[in-house]
Amino acid sequence: MADGATIVGRVRKTPSVARRGSLRRWLRRKSNVGFLMCLPLIVLIAALVIYPTVYAIYLSMLNKNMTQFVGLSNYAFLLKRNTFQLVFFQSCFFAVSAVILKATLGFILAHLLHNISGGNQRIVRGMLLTPWVIPLALSTLGWQWLFDPSYSAFNWVLNAFGFASVPWLGERWIARLCVIGVNVWYGTPFFMIMYLAALKSVPEQLYEAATIDGANAMQKLFFVTLPMMRNIISITVLFSLIVTFADFDIVRILTAGGPQDMTHIFATYAFEVGILSGDIPLGASVSLFILPILSICAYFVLRGVTRRSKEIAA
């Protein structure tokens, strides 16, 4: 009888022991432990992102007085509106051109810095990072003074050499280029520091092997450097595209969407329609147009990164 009771007890204890053993094995994996440590932050970020998004979708389906459900009428109204079509074009033009310029200039600066050794690199790197560490609103105010038609420093220099003053923020294409230029000035250091870190991680043996094979500088760039940096380039471009599409400070401070709505982007137009004009549902509809654009971009970029990571692992 005693032996029978012992066997029964062991049988009863077996499932719990097995569960504890599987839990220990699960916790031994570093990735699982890391996930558990990040879980509180993930939950917090999800709450801060999901709730505003769902609430914005709800608001976008109400009428101006927020008393009646109108479905997708606000979106249909925006798509037929010439001003919004212009905003859509300007947002895409602003984001794509600014990101391309930032990525290109950041890559060039990273290469130049990579060839500087010792303490000089730290000094130059710190100087080039200055635009990125200054608060954006403050630095944009400085640019506004430089572009001001009454006391523009740029126009003073042009006048000193006998050229006429330029309406930097008064002509639509010049204003667009000025807005893009300020965004590029602010965001290029981010690309520079990311690409510099990526360049330092490229093994020197690859360059030595390419030299032995007779490769010149351009061949090393296209067949060694760029393939090794593809993932970091993709991630930085995606991140910058998201931030640039959502940019507000630069356009709002420099032009407030003018002249004649010619520099409005999604964020500033949503602010004008939703806050200044008092049509919050329509403003929410404007802001939500960014979501599908960025979702499509993120899908293709992350799919490419995942595919390349699997190829490297294989």
Per-segment meaning from a language model:
Residues M1-R29:
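Short, Lys/Arg-rich, polar N-terminal cytosolic tail immediately upstream
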Residues K30-A314:
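A structural signal for multi-pass alpha-helical bundles of membrane permease subunits
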